[in-house]
Amino acid sequence: MTDNKSQKVITLMGPTASGKTALAIELVKQYNCEIISVDSALIYKEMDIGTAKPDAAEQAAAPHRLIDIIDPAKSYSAADFRRDALAQIEDILSRGKTPLLVGGTMMYFKALLEGLSPLPAADEVVRAQIACEAQEFGWQALHDQLREIDPVSAERIHPNDPQRLARALEVYRISGQSLTELTKTKSEAFPYEAVQFAIAPSDRKVLHRAIETRFKTMLTLGFTAEVERLKARGDLDLDLPSMRCVGYRQCWQYLDGEIDYETMVEKAIVATRQLAKRQLTWLRGWPDLIWLESGAEDNLATVMRHSR
């Protein structure tokens, strides 16, 4: 890929419920740009309400690329995102417009801007073997294995995160090298100039209230029925990345009778707040960010001024 630092892209990062979408739509109206979604929940079809997917009016005003691109039963990696995002960026730039990358999935932003390590492709035989071992011995035993071969990854990956735990073991068994060793090598650099913004309220209580209000609004819009439809498909379960999106797991547990309605609401709001906290932690360590206050009247002008 040709390196062309004279061509700009804009990134707009932020925690969930911080006002990213509203600002992005205003930018599309005022600035010659097109939106690329950077969100690991919005990629899924049939998951509209619980992911706060832009509605028909918002999509008409400002079409979003890389949403509704895969089925909830399928997987989609950071490497898949990087490939697809670079293709979308190139297409937008070729038509004389500015790509506007908007979202809160920091792993996707990191993969896009910093590159990825050359990890081995998935091996179904190895994966099946790991799954059998997990069924026989439990994920804790496999986590103990990981701790012996890759203590750094074991510290980062929880025993109750089977997808990432299995992947770390799979990488080692295929390559003979730990995930930590392999991630020291990165793929090619991002070939464009990135003007980077982050939006969040300075008062965390404001964000917490926004999260609570938004989830309760989702419920009135039919979120429970949405999860019921997904559950009724019969090919989805709580171990899939799609069903680990905040809110979906808790609603699924409610529909299974594991928790009552009030507990579901409380757990979903808490899980969303925890997600926002993790996103803010990433952002505080992110270099070269221009910070915006959620709801500030001059946000649009600030972005346009720095992006010219």
UniProtKB/Swiss-Prot annotation:
The record marks T105, R127 as: Interaction with substrate tRNA. SUPFAM superfamilies: P-loop containing nucleoside triphosphate hydrolases (SSF52540). The keyword Transmembrane helix does not apply. It holds the Pfam family IPPT. The keyword Hydrolase does not apply. One of its GO terms (molecular function) is ATP binding. It catalyses: adenosine(37) in tRNA + dimethylallyl diphosphate = N(6)-dimethylallyladenosine(37) in tRNA + diphosphate. Its cofactor is Mg(2+). Residues 39-42, 163-167, 244-249 are annotated as: Interaction with substrate tRNA. Belongs to the IPP transferase family. Monomer. This is tRNA dimethylallyltransferase. The lineage of its organism: Bacteria, Pseudomonadati, Pseudomonadota, Gammaproteobacteria, Alteromonadales.
